From Swiss-Prot:
Catalytically driven reaction(s): L-methionyl-tRNA(fMet) + (6R)-10-formyltetrahydrofolate = N-formyl-L-methionyl-tRNA(fMet) + (6S)-5,6,7,8-tetrahydrofolate + H(+)
Chain's role: Attaches a formyl group to the free amino group of methionyl-tRNA(fMet). The formyl group appears to play a dual role in the initiator identity of N-formylmethionyl-tRNA by promoting its recognition by IF2 and preventing the misappropriation of this tRNA by the elongation apparatus.
Family: Belongs to the Fmt family.
SUPFAM superfamilies: FMT C-terminal domain-like (SSF50486), Formyltransferase (SSF53328)
Protein name: Methionyl-tRNA formyltransferase
Repressor found in the keyword field: no
Residues where (6S)-5,6,7,8-tetrahydrofolate binds: S110, L111, L112, P113
MF-aspect GO terms: methionyl-tRNA formyltransferase activity
Pfam family, any one: Formyl_trans_N
GO cellular component, one term: cytosol
Keywords noted in UniProt: Protein biosynthesis, Transferase
EC number(s) per entry: 2.1.2.9
Superkingdom as given in the UniProt entry: Bacteria
Amino acid sequence: MRIIFWGTPDYSISSLDILIKSNHEIIAVVSQPDKKRSRGNKLIASPIKSFAEQEYIKIYTPEKIRNNIPFINELKSLSCDLFIVIAYGKILPKEILEIPKFGCWNAHASLLPRWRGAAPIQWSLMKGDEYTGVGIMKMSEGLDTGDLLLEEKIKIDNTDNLNTLTEKLSILSAKLLLKAVSFLEKNINKKINSKLTKQNTLGREITYARMIEKSDFKVDWGNEAIKISRKIKALYPRANTNFRGKNLKILKIKVLTSDEIKNAKYHLMSNYSKPGIILAVIENEGIIISTKTDPIILLEAKIEGKNISTKKQLIQQLKPSVGEYFLD
């Protein structure tokens, strides 16, 4: 099959790589334009563009795709069979969806129609979903509304964060995509639509995974401990707080159970009324902080200007005192 691959972040690389190594032909890659990503305002290529360059694949990085007649005509001239889209970053308009002979196909990192949109992995972690997965869908004009060809579900482990779950889903996306492309090749002359499943027949709630905003990264100590824990995992490694005027990225915490709270070794400060207050500083355990519900132990963090530190190192570096506050 002659394929044009659309993608931008690291997440897309495993899918492009597996297709390159297959018997299919990647005739071009479309990615987002180079962007200023460093303090020196240097233009940096997307991970997919950099990977495609190493593979000597023709690359397009249009500033816009809607009503871009020269670009659309260029795509038509390539006579491709399929568009494969993995985290490209823009919704493809109808005039582009209609170009490939056998449709545009997308691997979406959620159990659709749950978490349609830009940040499905983050929101599945943020909301404490027990399962997630990957769906291969035939793209339509709506936001992740297409009919599904394949789907596979995986359990979200308690230890998963954004990095680990993204890696798992990236590998799963690649595996399912190759399976889907092989199926499409074998069934070129058959009615594919009869093999597809409409999302509204799956009995799942429609939810939307909006883009993560700068304000989302702030830890709200007035929230429930479990929600704080989920946020830290979902936004790893960028969830942050403020201590004595310095930014502190929180990488790992533990929510104390009721039995642990009663454990005499913690000697928690008891006469507190506000969240975000330091309840105890215990050398071999860590810094214990109040929330709306249960206290949490700060296990791993990155202090502004320093490397990642674990609990004992954090105590040495921050020199915190019981009764001080972390600010959101």
